């Protein structure tokens, strides 16, 4: 199986996925980690991007992979992963803390108040938080594109038929509704895991190795089941 790994909004395209890519490679899978438009450069570049650009970039990267294919997405990447799995043959979908909805009720209005906002508290461990590789701030108008993608996602979730794993961060202070994402998935076989001590960035926080192993083991089991 060939795996596409999708990062989140404001996330570093590679480092935000922590140990996961290496664990997947060790298991024998080919992985690809594209940088979504506006990421891996500077925060202001997000102002040039619409949510359709993220969808298109993810789809292009996905279709370049040989079949059979699977997709793993973190946060916003979990939304993009669902869109891909709804449109194309997919062996497995993994959504890590998918950004079904934002916890901050002011998020839709921030662009009226301030031009930029600090990165959210996504890592609980204070020492690991100091090494957060993601954008330290983001333009508030860019959040509108994330919200637009969130608005489009519930309608595609029932069309997902791939085997699915959804992982919730027990101390997530960024997103909510992970259980709703799971409930709406049309996958006939789907599993749900919770890491109670982890913040939103599951692969950068204190349980990062355990999360990476859990995803690897679930994918191994899925690979064997589907052969």
Give the ranges of each region predicted by the language model.
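Gly/Ala-rich beta-loop-alpha elbow adjacent to hydrolase catalytic centers
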Residues: 73-81
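Catalytic active-site module of serine/aspartate enzymes centered on a nucleophile-bearing elbow/loop
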Residues: 197-227
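Active-site nucleophile elbow and catalytic-triad environment of alpha/beta-hydrolase enzymes
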Residues: 139-156
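Conserved alpha/beta-hydrolase "acid-adjacent" motif
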Residues: 173-179
